[in-house]
Amino acid sequence: MVEINKVAILGAGCWRTHAATGITTFKRACEVADETGIKEAALTHSSVTYAVELKHLAGVDEVVLSDPVFDADGFTVVDIEEDCDVDLDEFIKAHLEGNPEDVMPKLRDYVNDIADDVPKPPKGAIHFLSPEEMEDKLDIVVTTDDAEAVEDADMIISWLPKGGVQPDIFKKIIDDIPEGCIVANTCTIPTRQFKEMFEDMGRDDLQVTSYHPATVPEHKGQVFVAEGYADEEVVEAVYELGEKARGLAFKVPGYLLGPVCDMASAVTAIVYAGLLTFRDACTDILGAPVDFTQNMAVEALQMMAKFMEEEGLDKLEEALDPAALTNTADSMNFGPLADTEILPKALEVLEKYSKKAE
């Protein structure tokens, strides 16, 4: 049986990018505040929301959040009542009643105004609670020492920055990570690359999976757990932990984690819906064999990927007039492809892009 009694989270995040999108809210953080009775939980974001959930909803004995930014001069705490003129109780109420935009514009505007003056991590970050408040109000352990955080940990969640930073950080603490420890990536590094990173450091013993939110954690309660790298019982344990902590959990083949969870999920959703409706139109209505249908779909996907790679995403219309497909794909406009309106809408979009290219 896999037991997860101590979780170390590396990296605390910064809310500036969340404010910049103009769409994210604190819906999940406010739900956690409501469920736990800890009002300050509503003011958490990024991995801090994770920490509260794991401690108070999943019942993990010890949750440690580590980031050198906690000691940085640029660590900036925004007081939503004094700085943004938003009452905390009203903030929570608005989110729970489904009206987050009654309060969110003031937070976004304030953070966007100060963002240029606050250094980016690790020299600075924007939060709504101080490290002391995180410890006192949220009952989690806060540290700037990654080695201390991972000591005796059963699971490590990496909320570290994107790019080539993660290997350099993990190299410093690789010998401090317990044997057989579960290590989970989030949205800043692909699971495959995460696993290869540890293999390159001689740590084949580590159980690699993911704890990917597919959005910012304070906005929506969900987590995606990668299959295919860690032992099945480990994946199951992390999945069950995620269900308790985040409210909703999904198991996803590790190689699909990025396409399902990152920005290109918008592309994946369209492609997946197309595959499902194309399959049913061909097999159920035309009576085509599934292997024949699959081969046709595979060729379409592979050749479109090749087309984009060879021509460039910004030059697609120059290489192939989108209207070309409006005169071919319309012959498949029946059954599920038509009933769901996926193909008619696609043809409409292609026609618009064809006219834009003229």
From Swiss-Prot:
Annotated control of activity: Activity requires salt; 100 mM potassium phosphate, potassium chloride, and sodium chloride are equally effective.
A Pfam family that the UniProt record links to this protein: HMD
Thermal activity characteristics from the UniProt entry: Thermolabile at 90 degrees Celsius.
Catalytic activity: 5,10-methenyl-5,6,7,8-tetrahydromethanopterin + H2 = 5,10-methylenetetrahydromethanopterin + H(+)
Top-tier EC class: oxidoreductase
InterPro entries: 6-PGluconate_DH-like_C_sf, HMD, HMD_C, HMD_C_sf, HMD_N, METHMP_Hmd, NAD(P)-bd_dom_sf
UniProt-listed Enzyme Commission number(s): 1.12.98.2
Keyword Oxidoreductase: yes
Keywords assigned: Methanogenesis, One-carbon metabolism, Oxidoreductase
GO BP, sorted A to Z: methanogenesis, from carbon dioxide; one-carbon metabolic process
Protein's pathway: One-carbon metabolism; methanogenesis from CO(2); 5,10-methylene-5,6,7,8-tetrahydromethanopterin from 5,10-methenyl-5,6,7,8-tetrahydromethanopterin (hydrogen route): step 1/1
Single GO MF descriptor: N5,N10-methenyltetrahydromethanopterin hydrogenase activity
Function statement: Catalyzes the reversible reduction of methenyl-H(4)MPT(+) to methylene-H(4)MPT.
Family to which this protein belongs: Belongs to the HMD family.
Oligomer status and interactors: Homotetramer.
Record protein name field: 5,10-methenyltetrahydromethanopterin hydrogenase
Gene source species: Methanopyrus kandleri (strain AV19 / DSM 6324 / JCM 9639 / NBRC 100938)
Gene: hmd
